[in-house]
Curated annotation (Swiss-Prot):
It comes from the Eukaryota. Residues 1-34, 265-310 are annotated as: Disordered. Keywords: Cytoplasm, Initiation factor, Isopeptide bond, Phosphoprotein, Protein biosynthesis, Ubl conjugation. This is Eukaryotic translation initiation factor 3 subunit H. Residues 8-21, 270-289 have a biased composition (Low complexity). The lineage of its organism: Eukaryota, Metazoa, Chordata, Craniata, Vertebrata.
Length: 352
């Protein structure tokens, strides 16, 4: 089950009954060591997610919901979904877990797939690499190994290209999250970088044959668009917003680097003080020995020199991952527009 946090992500706490139910939907390849290699989504699910955002999403406000389906060998089939209702902190009487249980029970009564296989969330200009999403996906994936999170980008979709991606946490990151040790040494030992925190799973959208025939007929009847529109440049607002968000994350990364450098300087300074103290003790013991006096008693250096608390590095990895996402968005945007500029220049030279 999942408990929703307004506007940030959902913190999931899955029950054993849900995990057991998902296990019943597994095929031959549904053993614990298998990985989901493909996500198959019904077209109805995609439309429900889009409709949910259009009805309740506003600006930076995200919408979230539950994904239902089953696992067949190494393929996760998402056949239905339902949204988390929008509510505020004033709605103290609203029980999110009870709401999900009632929804799944109702779906089971009408013979619709009701097995919990993940969740979905909208994003604002690709801003989804957050601690809330990490904690939520870990809870889902820890209870149901095949769980995925679908990230829907309404801004890209509004520009004419459906943006829907499925992500899972990598096995290395799952182990680190289980240990709950995000110190620099632990992350270095696990060899985790921002590039290997999430793994993207390919998505295939499936429709019935009747829907495919209908789409084919509608495509034939639709008017042919003006070919010159293909060379129109996209709005610069998208690029400007991504650059602004990128600069904000770079500032956060800079502040985090300053904190880490301060920790390293304090650690180095303490090591020097500890070494100097040991040398003084050793010299004093040698002098006492030459005078025939007993050496000084041993002292617990860990009490005298308490090591500084290392800063958690998980937030730094998340910021780096979000910076990488913004860079990829900017790269994709500029590549498309530069291609159009070169094509327009070539056509102009040809016509002249």
């Amino acid at each position: 089950m999942a408990s929703r946090k307004e506007g940030t992500g959902s913190t999931a706490t899955s029950s054993s009954s849900t995990a057991g139910a998902a296990g019943k939907g597994k095929g031959k390849g549904g053993s614990g060591d298998s990985a989901v290699k493909q996500v198959q989504i019904d077209g109805l699910v995609v439309l429900k997610i889009i409709k949910h955002y259009q009805e309740e999403g506003q600006g930076t406000e995200v919408v979230q919901g539950v994904l239902l389906g089953l696992v067949v060998e190494d393929r996760l089939e998402i056949t239905n979904c339902f949204p988390f209702p929008q509510h505020t902190e004033d709605d103290a009487d609203f029980d999110e877990v009870q709401y999900q249980m009632e929804m799944m029970r109702s779906l089971r009564h009408v013979n619709i797939d009701h097995l919990h296989v993940g969740w979905y969330q909208s994003t604002y200009y690709g801003s989804f690499v957050t601690r809330a999403l990490l904690d939520s996906q870990f809870s889902y994936q820890h209870a149901i190994e095949e769980s995925v999170v679908l990230i829907y980008d309404p801004i890209k979709t509004a520009q004419g290209s459906l943006s829907l991606k499925a992500y899972r946490l990598t096995p290395k990151l799952m182990e680190v999250c289980k240990e709950k040790d995000f110190s620099p040494e632990a992350l270095k030992k696990a060899n985790i970088t921002f590039e290997y925190m999430f793994e993207e799973v390919p998505i295939v959208i499936k429709n019935s044959h009747l829907i495919n025939v209908l789409m084919w007929e509608l495509e034939k009847k639709s008017a042919v668009a003006d070919k010159h529109e293909l060379l129109s440049l996209a709005s610069s607002n998208h690029l400007g917003k991504n650059l602004q968000l990128l600069m904000d994350r770079v500032d956060e990364m800079s502040q985090d680097i300053v904190k880490y450098n301060t920790y390293m300087r304090n650690t180095s300074k303490q090591q020097q003080q500890k070494h100097q103290y040991q040398q003084r003790r050793q010299q004093e013991n040698m002098q006492r020995q030459s005078r025939g006096e007993p050496p000084l008693p041993e002292e617990d250096l860990s009490k005298l020199f308490k090591p500084p608390q290392p800063p958690a590095r998980m937030d730094s990895l998340l910021i780096a991952g979000q910076i990488n996402t913004y860079c990829q968005n900017i790269k994709e945007f500029t590549a498309q527009n530069l291609g159009k500029l070169f094509m327009a220049q070539a056509l102009q030279e040809y016509n002249n």
